Amino acid sequence: MSVSLLQPSFLMSKTRSYAQILIGSWLFLTAMAIYLSLGVAPLDFQQGGNSRILYVHVPVAWMSIIVYIATAINTFLFLLTKHPLYLRSSGTGIEMGAFFTLFTLVTGGFWGRPMWGTFWVWDARLTSVFILFFIYLGALCFQKLSVELASILICVGLIDIPIIKFSVNWWNTLHQPGSISRFGTSIHVSMLIPILSNFANFLFLTCILFVLETRLLILSFLESSITEEIEAREGIPKPSSLALFASMAEWLKRPT
């Protein structure tokens, strides 16, 4: 990536237009996803209305994994470059990923209660997703102590991603094997479209939050001095350490 692409003026000008496009698209996708999930998609003949939970559960499960991979990439880039934007992006990813993973577990529990007779079973897929949630929580806690510890945890935690993906193939689980693959899908198109619509909805929402976080990071340093920022955080252990502020100050002074 060209260094010029990470300059404040370039990012502020581009993210302004991107944010408007993303927000407009997200509002449209939200309305469409709700309409398709509640008004168009047919009920499963075995699950009844309970099948509508899957139109949300499946997309957020995908997002929990996608956000983790994106967070790991940002974490790795931060360790290589020490650029503050990568640190902020990884922090946003950890928060978003924890939310999506928790939402996955909760919606899965509500779906499983009438179908399996219980909110929770120690199924291989459930357990591996549960571990992913604790990896996110651990990274959130470590961020307050050491950015490096949080980064290492995120990188090591990548091993859980293929376990989540292939757990239904490696072990005998209550979850069925994947219904969507590069070879095709076993889901009827009337049910597939609402799932993909909700997935696009959550994906756009995540992109919006990443863009807004980028703008907020830049504005927070442009509108107040580095000294004031350090004093405001004095005594509060946060990943935004003195080194990060110095790095940000140097970055903002670079010629555009």
Curated annotation (Swiss-Prot):
Belongs to the CcmC/CycZ/HelC family. Keywords: Cytochrome c-type biogenesis, Membrane, Mitochondrion, Transmembrane, Transmembrane helix. It comes from the Eukaryota. This is Putative cytochrome c biosynthesis ccmC-like mitochondrial protein. The gene is CCMC. GO terms for biological process: cytochrome complex assembly. PANTHER family: CYTOCHROME B_B6 PROTEIN-RELATED, HEME EXPORTER PROTEIN C. It holds the Pfam family Cytochrom_C_asm. GO terms for molecular function: heme binding; heme transmembrane transporter activity. InterPro entries: Cyt_c_assembly (IPR002541), Cyt_c_biogenesis_CcmC (IPR003557), Cyt_c_biogenesis_CcsA/CcmC (IPR045062). It is found in: Mitochondrion membrane. A stretch of 270 kb of the mitochondrial genome is duplicated within the centromere of chromosome 2 resulting in the duplication of the gene. The expression of the duplicated genes (At2g07681 and At2g07771) is demonstrated. One of its GO terms (cellular component) is mitochondrial membrane. Signal peptide: none annotated. It is a multi-pass membrane protein. The chain crosses the membrane at residues 21-41, 60-80, 91-111, 129-149, 151-171, 192-212. Its main location: mitochondrion. The keyword Transport does not apply. May be involved in the export of heme to the mitochondrion for the biogenesis of c-type cytochromes.
